[in-house]
């Protein structure tokens, strides 16, 4: 017996897939998650048990997905093809498909297949097949033509036969059907001609397959409403020759013969099939389950909103498009027996308990028919357990690395870490890296002399970490005053607390120039706009800032007078950078970091006044550099933006103005900022006046044109 349970829609929003339905539904790396590809631009990852999407990815406007997205079970990544030739590979962390891995192929792709236990395969429209790894190694390799002219691929399936991958695809040419079977263990491609027999004028509308010990069972649903079965030998006697296959009728009139669309077929187990379609010409479309052994209808569910004629089957769930919604229909099938068919099979136990059958399935015992899916699954589990037992002594590389961290020397750890990072990344790679850093920091605290700086640098440069994955790393780097690691963390971590950001700023402003000179700092953000500064000049300038008081600049009026008397000298002084290039690169990392003003301001108040002044001078220098360009931007790679510079100037003044205003060397800077703000207000005011003038001129011009268009001349007659 079989039962169809109440179906449910995966989402409350209609699937934007058009009238033809989605391109496909494919299983993800987890049994409860599925990739749904619509016939437009979008791939959605759904979790069936929660009935909600976990992620969504779309190609650019103007591009179109041409084959269903699949999951690479070996890497956990997703693969899709758009515009027939462009292959994209991404994972859950990616957001924009336009920025993920891209490979443009030399031929049009029909389908990508991926199953557990082997690498994905790419089937081209001309019938050629390539493994994904070989194709990515040379995307523009020449693809041969396997099928003849005007042959079109109609259906394809990828499965494992005795642990070896087998691909089957069916083509059609002028009403004739051909079956190709590609076995990859022997590299043999077998071709068969499918003889339709009495139903030669009929069109095959749907295919489905199952695998037994000796044969591949190919079932087809024809336009006459009947289901036919064809047995394809797994080991053909003459694989190189074009052989013929004869169909035999399995079920009669399962759907209406007049149905031209909305028809599909799926094999559920050795005795049951699911059929999608209208059973009578005037009836609505239905989802029904048939018993092929006794040729009886087991259950049926009406679909009043119609369907697209697509049916997918995974585990105990059927997927189909009902109206505009992708719907999941759970089902249950019991093993067929004569007693069960006649209603005489006794069930003494509760319905939830699976009792041992009270009959013998002779076909399964003798191995003559198709092996049941459950028995094959148990055998696969048994074989897999044997394999797992045989490889159990092998310790994972991450576990070995964590053990090495606890006892070996720093040099040996660095070598082992380099080997580990060279291996293929797994889906949990970022958590493993976080565990490795936590292990290193734990040993650093236990052994004060142990500090593997190079190892920590390598781990941060993997670009998979965040502050929350290794919360103690930046605090430990602050203790060691390791500005190199702090700079990297500020550049890469998106979730650094404001207190840690301010602590980094204090270190960057207070560390000596001699220490920075011997430190390797990333200079990308300052290389194109920072003028080289002589050591003598910088020492003199630093000394001036540290002395903190100059009698010549005792009062504010004299500063303003000097600004009026010597504008050129003031300009020269402002355009010289107040910090060394390496310190500037560190400060730029702070400018790029994310923050919230509410949480940042209290910590900025703890920065010493002299350091705040130095930072303000550097920010003002950056603003002047921006003003030199018409675009108001700094040259180079990842320089600070004008908005970042202005925001930090405002933040520093809000937090420290009452303290900074009391420092003598800050007077000229504050006056310069005052003059700058005043000039900006003046410029804005003048621009507003110009805008008003232009509007008035435009208004007068419009009135003049209107008078010319609608003027009437009056002539006085005597």
Curated annotation (Swiss-Prot):
GO terms for cellular component: nucleolus; t-UTP complex. It comes from the Eukaryota. GO terms for biological process: maturation of SSU-rRNA; positive regulation of transcription of nucleolar large rRNA by RNA polymerase I. It is found in: Nucleus, Nucleolus. Keywords: Activator, Methylation, Nucleus, Ribosome biogenesis, rRNA processing, Transcription, Transcription regulation. The modification N6-methyllysine is found at residue 346. Pfam families: Nol11_C, NOL11_N. InterPro entries: NOL11 (IPR042859), Nol11_C (IPR048897), NOL11_N (IPR012584), WD40_repeat_dom_sf (IPR036322). Interacts with UTP4. Interacts with FBL/fibrillarin in a transcription-dependent manner. May associate with the proposed t-UTP subcomplex of the SSU processome containing at least UTP4, WDR43, HEATR1, UTP15, WDR75. Ribosome biogenesis factor. May be required for both optimal rDNA transcription and small subunit (SSU) pre-rRNA processing at sites A', A0, 1 and 2b. This is Nucleolar protein 11. It comes from Bos taurus.
